[in-house]
């Protein structure tokens, strides 16, 4: 997919997801245990919105799912395993730079006994340790 029609915005191997197009990527895989994983990507937010659009979602069923969404101008990382919430993090960092790209890395270990060890979020290489909500 190409951004806009302008070649200046054409970044090799990049994707642009426009909600009006209902575009998405999918991968069906049985690799791994689904309890420990990492997700890494570059993102550029195009504007402020009060909705909670999904950046990434994956689910086996309604009781086993993971999602990364926009929560107003923050990111939210959420995981439900066996019907129990294992991860729900909303870092305090706000995304208000609509011109720049941001690197995000999310790691999860839903088997960890201590809730603070279950998930970590890095934004532009900085571990996020201040949260508006962490549960």
Residue ranges of model-derived segments:
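Extracytoplasmic low-complexity segments
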Residues: 1-21, 32-34, 38-39
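Extracellular glycan-recognition modules
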Residues: 20-83, 112-115
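Short hydrophobic/aromatic-rich beta-strand segments that constitute the beta-sheet cores
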Residues: 76-79, 121, 130
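Short tryptophan-centered beta-strand motifs in secreted/extracellular beta-sheet-rich domains
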Residues: 41, 99-110, 121
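Surface-exposed loop/edge segments in extracytoplasmic proteins
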Residues: 63-66, 84-89, 126-131
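Short, aromatic/His-centered strand-loop micro-motif at the edge of beta-sheets
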Residues: 78-103
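Short, solvent-exposed beta-strand-to-loop segments that form ligand-recognition rims
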Residues: 116, 123-135
